[in-house]
């Protein structure tokens, strides 16, 4: 907390000095340089509070626009950042975490958005409030459409609902009318009412306010164009209220769609997700190849189905049937029936698509390296390393430092994995959970070290092979291979993913170890996907 306060005070001092340096002239700077530190601090504080009380005035500057979208999404009135916005940015940078994902890595989409935000103004409360006011003053049309949909399906105006059903049925049966609908709407809902406002009909004694004959001659009224509603108006308050109430429509829709996607598409149940993937892939392929023929053959059936479904859904929402339908849908019997059907379907899919794979169990290897002391003729530990350090290795030929540790307990599992300790009768020697590899022939063949190492069958040490030549009288030479001054043996330990349960880890590891024990001593070990261990 103290460091946070110190950072804030330092930011205040920096910003106050920047404001004072840009706002003052040379004389003021000379006077400020002669002041004491306490007086300069008080002057800076007064200047900060004055900047809060009075808006900062900056000369208008022209900004070179990099693209059309930058001009569209940036404010053209004010491009300067006030002191309040700078402090707000500092608070956000200190309060918000630097990452957005659980594993500590930024998503690619977040990084792309951050890169795009660099050419736009930063978050500002003033700009946010201005943009919100401008949006609310122009947000009447969506809320009017939502109200019309509610009126139609609530049967508040039965004739209006029936008219909508007839028009919708006509559009379904003859889809080409969808192209002509915007033209008719523009003519009869925009142009004709605008003409009637410019040429209002005279009052008729018999027809009263329904006289269809407009006034003759030139226009008798001014042009009434749509414009944003003012802030102090009832329509603005209605827009604010509707925005507050209709926000939950998007929230509920988002939550519903997300729940379905997470349950069926994100491998929460692998069998169901695989079945959906195969079904979607097959459907997409068939529609790509035979979609035109299938749709042309089924088009009449689709039209009739959509029309009947629209009428049935609208009639079901009638007040006389709505309460009965909702009671039936929200009843406990319906919920249990749907739950049983879904469970039965999931059980059938799990039975037919038994694709449960065995969990990954990997071997982690480490080599114990020792060298022969020429004075005492005793073997001394070099280190535990992931490199077997053969005689022809690059590190050994170039005298490079060998990475390792002196204690076996300090060896860490690979990232994303954790060790599992299993006691078996195959390896009786165990040190800190590590098991001695009793079949070194396997890893020697894997690393193509057959000609450079000699195996001690008793303790499973692998010695360097050194070739010595001896010359005899004449032209003959004798080769003799002896053991070198470095030996190593392999320790293994099993590791599993760190997201598994402990019971599953033990079961899978024991099964894996039993399969390994049944292999022949001359057989090759499985190729390991993890070959390095951090020491």
From Swiss-Prot:
With PEX23, contributes to the formation of endoplasmic reticulum-mitochondria junctions which are important for mitochondrial function. Involved in lipid dropplets formation. Glycans are attached at residues 239, 271, 450, 515. Disruption phenotype: Does not lead to any peroxisomal phenotype. Reduces the number of lipid droplets and leads to fragmented and clustered mitochondria. Also results in retarded growth and reduced mitochondrial activities. It is found in: Endoplasmic reticulum membrane. Coiled coil: none annotated. Belongs to the PEX28-32 family. PEX29 subfamily. This is Peroxisomal membrane protein PEX29. It comes from Ogataea parapolymorpha (strain ATCC 26012 / BCRC 20466 / JCM 22074 / NRRL Y-7560 / DL-1). The lineage of its organism: Eukaryota, Fungi, Dikarya, Ascomycota, Saccharomycotina. It comes from the Eukaryota. GO terms for cellular component: endoplasmic reticulum membrane; peroxisomal membrane. The keyword Glycoprotein applies. Keywords: Endoplasmic reticulum, Glycoprotein, Membrane, Transmembrane, Transmembrane helix. GO terms for biological process: peroxisome organization. The chain crosses the membrane at residues 139-159, 176-196, 247-267, 272-292, 297-317. It is a multi-pass membrane protein. Residues 511-535 are annotated as: Disordered.
């Amino acid at each position: 907390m103290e460091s946070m306060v110190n950072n804030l005070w330092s930011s205040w001092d920096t910003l106050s000095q920047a404001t004072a340096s840009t706002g003052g002239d040379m004389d003021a700077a000379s006077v400020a340089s002669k002041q004491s530190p306490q007086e300069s601090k008080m002057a800076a504080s007064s200047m900060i509070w004055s900047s809060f009380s009075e808006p900062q005035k900056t000369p208008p500057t022209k900004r070179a626009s990099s693209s059309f979208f930058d001009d569209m999404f940036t404010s053209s009135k004010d491009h300067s950042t006030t002191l309040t916005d700078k402090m707000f940015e500092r608070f956000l940078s200190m309060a918000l975490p630097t990452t957005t994902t659980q594993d500590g890595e930024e998503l690619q989409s977040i990084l792309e958005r951050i890169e795009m935000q660099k050419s736009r103004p930063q978050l500002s409360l003033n700009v946010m409030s201005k943009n919100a006011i401008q949006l609310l003053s122009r947000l009447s049309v969506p809320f009017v459409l939502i109200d019309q949909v509610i009126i139609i399906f609530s049967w508040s105006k039965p004739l209006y609902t029936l008219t909508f059903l007839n028009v919708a049925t006509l559009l379904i049966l003859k889809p080409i009318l969808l192209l002509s609908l915007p033209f008719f709407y523009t003519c009869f809902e925009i142009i004709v009412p605008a003409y009637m406002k410019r040429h209002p009909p005279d009052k008729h004694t018999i027809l009263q306010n329904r006289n269809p004959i407009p006034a003759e001659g030139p226009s008798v009224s001014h042009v009434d164009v749509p414009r944003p509603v003012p802030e102090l108006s009832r329509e603005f308050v209605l827009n604010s209220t509707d925005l507050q109430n209709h926000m939950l429509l998007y929230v509920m829709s988002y939550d519903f769609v997300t729940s379905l996607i997470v349950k069926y598409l994100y491998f929460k149940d692998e069998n169901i997700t695989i079945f959906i993937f195969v079904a979607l892939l097959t459907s997409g392929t068939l529609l790509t190849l035979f979609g035109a023929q299938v749709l042309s053959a089924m088009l009449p059936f689709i039209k009739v189905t959509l029309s009947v479904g629209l009428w049935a859904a609208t009639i079901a929402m009638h007040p006389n049937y709505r309460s009965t339908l909702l009671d039936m849908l929200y009843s406990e019997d319906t919920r249990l029936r749907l739950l049983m059907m879904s469970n039965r379907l999931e059980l059938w899919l799990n039975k037919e698509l038994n694709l449960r794979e065995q969990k990954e169990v990997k071997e982690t290897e480490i080599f114990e390296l020792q060298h022969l002391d020429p004075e005492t003729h005793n073997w001394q530990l070099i280190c535990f390393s992931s490199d077997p350090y053969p005689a022809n290795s690059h590190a050994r030929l170039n005298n490079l430092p060998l990475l390792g540790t002196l204690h076996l307990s300090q060896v860490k599992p690979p990232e994303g994995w954790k060790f599992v300790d299993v006691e078996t009768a195959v390896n009786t020697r165990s040190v800190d959970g590590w098991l001695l590899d009793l079949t070194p022939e396997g890893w020697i063949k894997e690393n193509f070290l057959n000609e450079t190492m000699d195996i001690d069958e008793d303790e499973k040490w692998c010695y360097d092979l050194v070739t010595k030549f001896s010359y005899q009288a004449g032209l003959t030479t004798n080769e003799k291979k002896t053991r070198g001054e470095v030996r190593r043996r392999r320790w293994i330990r099993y590791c599993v993913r760190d997201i598994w349960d402990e019971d599953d880890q033990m079961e899978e590891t024991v099964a894996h170890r039993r399969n390994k024990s049944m292999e022949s001593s001359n057989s090759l070990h499985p190729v390991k996907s993890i070959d390095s261990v951090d020491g």
